[in-house]
Design a protein with these regions (language model features):
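Conserved metal-binding segment of the jelly-roll/cupin
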Residues: 80-100, 109, 222-243
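Extended, compositionally biased flexible segments
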Residues: 31-98
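A gly/proline- and charged-residue-enriched helix-loop-helix capping module
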Residues: 77-88, 113-138
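A short glycine-rich, His/Asp/Glu-containing loop-to-beta-strand
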Residues: 11-44, 137-187
Length: 256
């Protein structure tokens, strides 16, 4: 198995539920961090040379300060419950956020152009149903080229796949092959749900396929709740949700 697969708990630190810097991944741009307010009620981060997206996963009424400017994130009870509001964080900003319980994600990208801080309410997040048949899934466009242009490098979206369906289809890549001019690193963070629950559940499993043209990597991983997978290059897909166990994944992408 490649070292691209990061099982749940393997990226935990004293400060983070998940801490995945560009250096940890052996690449240049994408960072992925999650924080649990049950561990600590307030966190402070300085985004030196980075821009970011602050996105509640399973927390509500989060107080946020971005370079002294105050915001409140309404959040959500869990990723399967609803779309959440979020905040774009400028390059070089100092960010503090506090809450009583639950988890929040900070997605980052190495960047140099500075854009203003921006709060986006949940009702303004562009939600689309993509695919058909067993490839039907919901995409929440957080910071994508069609939904948010006031950023430099970062791209963030959420995908919810009903139990028994698949997503990341057809298999695709972002490494400047003919017909695709972009180069993007990509992080997948998964939660495996259970019918009728707002949260991930340790009972279910899903599956994820990744392969490279030179066949140095060709693997299908059995996914458990809160697993992470980094994709520096190569084809990825499908992501398969087992019957009765819907799948959520959060993507962050960035590149030159």
């Amino acid at each position: 198995m490649s070292n691209w697969y990061k099982p749940a708990g393997s990226l935990k630190t004293s400060e983070h539920e998940i801490s995945l810097s560009p250096q940890d991944s052996g690449w240049e741009y994408c960072g992925f961090y999650t924080y649990n307010f049950a561990t600590k009620s307030e966190f402070t981060v300085e985004l030196n040379g980075r821009e970011g997206v602050l996105l509640p996963l399973s927390t509500q009424n989060v107080s946020v300060s971005v370079d002294g400017q105050a915001f409140t994130l309404k959040g959500r009870t869990g990723v399967f419950a609803a779309v959440s509001d979020w905040i774009y964080l400028p390059v070089g900003s100092k960010v503090s956020f506090s809450g009583k319980s639950g988890e929040i994600a900070l997605l980052t990208a190495q960047a140099s152009e500075k854009f203003p801080v921006c709060y986006t309410p949940a009702e303004q997040v562009q939600v689309e149903v993509r695919g058909s048949g067993k490839a039907t899934r919901q995409v929440n466009n957080i910071a994508t080229p069609t939904s948010f242009t006031q950023c430099h490098k970062i791209l963030v979206c959420e995908v919810l796949t009903p139990g028994g369906n698949l997503s990341s289809w057809p298999p695709h890549r972002h490494d400047k092959f003919p017909g695709c001019p972009t180069i993007n690193e990509e992080v997948y963070y998964f939660q495996i749900g259970k019918e009728g629950s707002d949260h991930g559940d340790p009972e279910g499993v899903g599956f994820f396929h990744v392969y490279t043209v030179d066949e140095t990597v060709d693997e299908t991983v059995t996914l458990h709740d809160r697993d992470t997978y980094v994709v520096p290059h190569g084809y990825h897909g499908p992501s398969i949700a087992s019957p009765e166990y819907p799948m959520y994944f959060l993507n962050v992408m960035a590149g030159p």
